Every structure is written in C-alpha cells, then in structure tokens.
C-alpha cells in the first residue's frame, strides 16, 4: 500500500506550483482528492505541491473512518491526514483552487476576491479542459488557468450543479465509494492536464 505522508510545511508553496482542494470539513472530499492527485503525480512531476483545506474545518482532526476505508481500496493510506481550516495564506499561495461546491467557491472569493479567477469546481476543470486550447499551444501554466476562466464566459457564478461533488459525510459507505470513484476519475484527467501545463513551463 502506498503510504502518503500528509505533513504540512510552515509556509505553503515550496513547490513551483500549488494546487489546493477545498471542501467543508476537510475530513473526506478534499483530502481524498488531495491523496488521489498526489498519488498520480508521484510518477509524473515533482514540481507540484498539493494541499487541501476546509471552509469550516476544525483543526487537527483526522479523515473520517469511511474515507480511510474507501481509500484503502485504491491502496492509499489516509490515516495520517490532519484537517486544516482554509485561510488567506493558503488561498494566496495556490495557483489553482479546486472547490467541491459553489458555496465553497463563494467562501474562497470572500477570503481573496482575486482568487475567483483561479477557482473552479472539480467537475468543471475536466469539462472546460476539453474546450480550451491545447496546453502545448499555450505559453505558461498561468495562461492555461486564464484560458479555463475565460471558457466560463465571464460569469461570476461558475460551474453547474453537475460539476459539484456531493458531501458523503454521515452517509453510507456506498456514498463514499461513489464520491471516491468520481474524484479518482477527475484527478486522473487533472493529473494529465497539470503535467502537460507544468512541463510546458519547464
């Protein structure tokens, strides 16, 4: 089993690029997404740092037992995860922010209004990524994020309900499995997109 150590730096941003996943409590959705993406990036690039936080998280808790159990099916150990509350420093450091729902997007923009342009729903990135210019045709990672934002048509309310990831907290293990399967698929595509974008900047 791959053991991912969820150690936090005192200052986020040691990697060249910082990707941030955001949910509510930072106990299931965002840490699962963080783990999936970290797992996939291990063999592709070392230039990306992946973190997660919750808009209403209580600090220093662990992932839910259901999340830990489900991730074992993917050979990922989530037992070392520690919850973190979303804050200004974390938002400012992130080049790309992936929110689970539209209310999470709103919470992020309240912390830093400029972050709105680089914040997307989890399903939205995959959907828009297929619509914009090929990454290899763009000059930088930043320009790719800008293209993603432009593809939304300039609307302040982004994404669709189908782009959101439902909260499995206090629900059945089956619901956790459904969320995990979807996040795994999204992170698979996101890994390919990010790797191409980062390699473009190398």
Feature annotation, model-predicted:
Residues 2-9, 109-202:
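Phosphate-binding/catalytic loops
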Residues 101-102, 123:
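Short secondary-structure boundary segments
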């Amino acid at each position: 089993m791959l053991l991912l150590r969820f150690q936090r730096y005192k200052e986020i941003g040691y990697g060249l690029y910082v990707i941030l996943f955001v949910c509510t409590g930072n106990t299931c959705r965002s840490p699962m997404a963080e783990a999936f993406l970290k797992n996939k990036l291990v063999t592709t690039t070392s230039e990306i740092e992946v973190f997660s936080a919750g808009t209403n998280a209580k600090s220093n808790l662990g992932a839910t037992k259901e999340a830990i159990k489900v991730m074992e099916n993917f050979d990922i150990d989530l037992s070392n995860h520690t919850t973190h509350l979303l804050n200004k420093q974390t938002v400012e450091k992130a080049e790309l922010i992936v929110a689970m729902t539209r209310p999470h997007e709103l919470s992020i923009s309240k912390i830093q209004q400029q972050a709105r342009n680089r914040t997307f729903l989890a399903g939205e990135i995959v959907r828009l990524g297929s619509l914009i210019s090929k990454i290899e045709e763009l000059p930088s990672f930043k320009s790719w994020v800008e293209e993603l934002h432009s593809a939304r048509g300039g609307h302040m309310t982004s994404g669709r309900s189908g782009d959101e990831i439902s909260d499995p907290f206090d629900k059945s293990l089956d619901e956790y499995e459904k969320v995990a399967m979807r996040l795994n698929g999204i992170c698979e595509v996101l890994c390919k997109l990010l790797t191409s974008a980062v390699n473009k900047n190398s």
